[in-house]
Amino acid sequence: MQIAYSFKKAKVFLVLILFNIHFIYSGPVKPKDPILRLAVIGLVHDHVNWILNRQKEDVKIVGIVETNKKAIARYQKRYSLSNDLFFDSYESMYKTVKPDAVSAFNPTKEHLDVVRYFAPKRIPIMVEKPMATTYKEAQEMAELSKKFNVPLLVNFETSWYESTYEAKKLLETNSFGSLTKMVFNTGHPGPQEIGCTPEFLDWLTDPILNGGGALTDFGCYGANIATWLLNGETPLRVSCVAKQSKPDRYPKVDDDTTIILDYEKKKVVIQASWNWSHNRKDMQIYGSKGYVNCKNAKDMILMKNEQVGEKKHIPQPISEAKKDPFRLLYEVVYKDVILEPYSLYSIENNLIVSKILSLASESSKTQKTQNWK
């Protein structure tokens, strides 16, 4: 019995030794990645559902700034948001929660106010497209970002599309020849028609708060992608026809707009409308030897040889940061990711976008082509 007892003690001792050896040589426990403590600025942009619906643990909403009681009640009920998340001013929210970053879902006209308040505090900022209602506002936002060395991102839905990135890769192979034309068709049947919330409609259809109608709402997509594909090249001239097809519904702003960007050796046509028969964000890119047709986020059609004809093409998968703007914001804050100049979210790109939209607006009012100055 004594021998059996001693053997058991020896086994226990051996197990303890092996455990300690494993603990010593397995190295330190890897710390958990930090959580991005995000403040949401505004609930009156229906895109806010993107962050409220997001079911990932790397980003946590720690504060919401909103004064619209109807919007607050709607989203509190839909997402079971606690009362202590809500604040009625930037200042009260900032003093209470000290967020790591802010994401703006307020009227475009108020983007500048967000940057004016949070940039001096060196809080990274992401706003919804477009960057601003005027080029002058966009310039001030860019200057504040540079002065305080704080990231400023502009979020477009098409920046999450696999087809968008695949199109650039295909163009860089030169297998479609030299680029000659790009056509962007963006929009939907109309904000009222698709059921936008009243709070969203109030400012989306206001020429001051939104900077225009379909021109700014959907003209920005084509300008953004074209600027990226052309590596920051600017057009020589901007022409625009902005119409009111439904003045009874949208009496203050345009609802069906065509923008033409004239470059030295190529042309870009942007058809931005609240009068399409269906939702669409598609683009056709034409080269001297063929074309790339991005029908939506994932479906593509290519043609390199007319005799062979068209063929379907499946885009390559993209990284999580490209598919998810909030993951990109996380990596900008915690992984020191720096946006490339003229990339889709970048200030450089969106300054050009803002100037294009401003010149397009002027062209539609004067009925004259505007030169790039």
Model regions and ranges:
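Bacterial N-terminal signal peptides that target proteins for export
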Residues: Q2-F13
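Bacterial N-terminal signal peptides
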Residues: F13-H22
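N-terminal Rossmann-like dinucleotide-binding module
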Residues: I21, Y25-S80
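C-terminal helix-rich "cap/oligomerization" subdomain common to oxidoreductases
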Residues: P28-K32, A101-A104, V332-K373
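Predominantly a Rossmann-like dinucleotide-binding segment in NAD(P)-dependent oxidoreductases
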Residues: D46, Y161-R249, Q367
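Beta-loop-alpha module in the N-terminal Rossmann-like domain of NAD(P)-dependent dehydrogenases
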Residues: A71, L81-L144
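Rossmann-fold dehydrogenase core element
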Residues: E140-T158, T180
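Contiguous beta-strand/loop segments that form the cofactor/metal-binding neighborhood of enzyme cores
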Residues: N224-D299, R327-L339, L359
